[in-house]
Amino acid sequence: MNERITGAEALIKSLIAEGVDLVFGYPGGAIIPVYDKLYDYTDQLKHILVRHEQGATHAAQGYARVTGRPGVVIVTSGPAATNVITGLSDALMDSTPLVVITGQVASSFLGSDAFQETDVVGITQPITKWAYQIRRAEDIPWAVARAFYIANTGRPGPVVLDIAKDAQNGLLEWSHQKCTYIRSYIPYPKINDEDLKAAADIINSAKRPMILSGHGVMISGAEKELAAFAEKADIPVAATLLGLSTMPSDHRLYKGMLGMHGNIGPNINTNRSDVIIAIGMRFDDRVTGDTSKYAPQAKIVHIDIDSSEFDKNIKTDATIHGDAREVLEKLLPLINPADHSEWLKTFDECAKVEREKVIEREVFRTEGTMTMGEVAHKVSKATGDKAVLVTDVGQNQMFSSRYFRYTDPKSILTSGGLGTMGFGLPASIGAKMGAPERTVCFFTGDGGLQMTIQELGTIMEYGTDVKIILLNNNFLGNVRQWQELFFNSRFSQTPMVNPDFVAIANAYGIAAENVETREQLDDAIARMLNHKGAYMLNVNIDPTDMIFPMTPAGAAVDDIMLNANEKYQIN
């Protein structure tokens, strides 16, 4: 007979059996038994004490994105459980595997409005792959195994285990077996040969094809397969925001980012192409613009692990249901070698206009206050284009993702679908802990930073070496831009009165400096990157700086603003 242990200890042992060595969390009354047993396993399971439960979920997301393994969160009941809601929703939208464990009142108190009782399962079911309440200690091992299997297979996402306090204190004979099968859950479908052939026939007939590379390529680890596929058929590749770094920025076939603030070539040529091959992306509104005017001339081939995305936003001509890497491996032999050099030249022509009309004015300005684009460009260059870029949300997100260059996969972490301000600081902590050998550069604005600024305390406690670039324009810049362009410059509640960010960083033991002029910028970046430990640059940014190109919300994808007064002229 195996030794009987408590449910709390069974949880810890089950996490370790699943390969977990790092968790993010915050203790409280309904989860105290777990934290008590954690005390005995600190040599096997490191716990990161965040400063807010939302920060735990975003840190776990950062960790999961760079490692490909589920991020784990442990929090108590009530307000702690409701504080993880934003992170769960963000993880579901961006297909990030999380296992979030919440404490719960004892089973006998459920439904009585006990102290710090909330209906965690009811609240989280719409924003998770699986939410389950555990009321018996003996259910903990199998539930943990199932949670990890669901979170990290198929289209990844978050799961929640809500563990009643009596289940934590109850006794069981512990053993753990990893889950490899759940009836009615088929995470990796068998790829249909007829679907492959139908897609190949369309692709082989193309004269002006485009590949749209999404987050699914990164999740699948299909970067090499993507390159081989594109090279054989000589097809240009554009990436969604979350698909950035799935192809190196300097690859001859890589043509830039799609979307509202993407590069001109990919957006314009979406409506010039005759075949679009979408891989691991979901045609969300920030990519398509007005769906009634999206690529009406093109045949669309959609490859995705989640069949619910097919025909949801854009009507397709062929679909392949499967993992991106496996699909590309099977599709490659069916694709004919091709030469699309004339088609590729049209992207270069668009890039020339973009450089003259947008990039030169943004990145290579010599007068006036600094711009976000020039800061991002210089930081990327100073890292040899090898850093992991973590962004917050807003103008800082768009500028940094546009002007960073990517050499290696998994080099960008950002909140794409939900657009969560405050995501970046805790996510950068998780990213650095998951990839300690890589430089992590976190770009943020003065608005987003202050939403989770308390996580500077986590950086202080654990000595996390995150480079923080605060693009400080004393405005909620993205909203300000919309107000200037579309609401007659009525700047309602967007100017900000800010604290002394350098003093705040210093109070947390973090080296920091103000950067007031572009003459100071290069040396400040060098000091930041050479410093051993966290470092913050508080960079004075032109508040009138706006992110272009821009496809206005609801406009056609090729209706592109070059600046506030000029649109791209389609030939």
Where are each of the predicted segments found?
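Phosphate/pyrophosphate-binding active-site segments
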Residues: 1, 138, 175-176, 297-393, ...
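Short acidic loop-to-helix transition motifs that present clustered carboxylates
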Residues: 53-58, 81, 396-398, 517-521
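A general structural motif
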Residues: 52-53, 112-114, 186-200, 258-262, ...
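N-terminal alpha/beta PP-like core and its mobile active-site loop of ThDP/TPP-dependent enzymes
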Residues: 2-342, 378, 382-385, 465-468, ...
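Conserved short loop/turn motifs at secondary-structure junctions
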Residues: 214-218, 364, 445
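Generic enzyme active-site microenvironment
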Residues: 160, 302, 390, 443-444
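Thiamine diphosphate
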Residues: 101, 115-116, 260, 311-313, ...
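Active-site diphosphate/adenylate-binding microenvironment
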Residues: 8-12, 16, 20-21, 29, ...
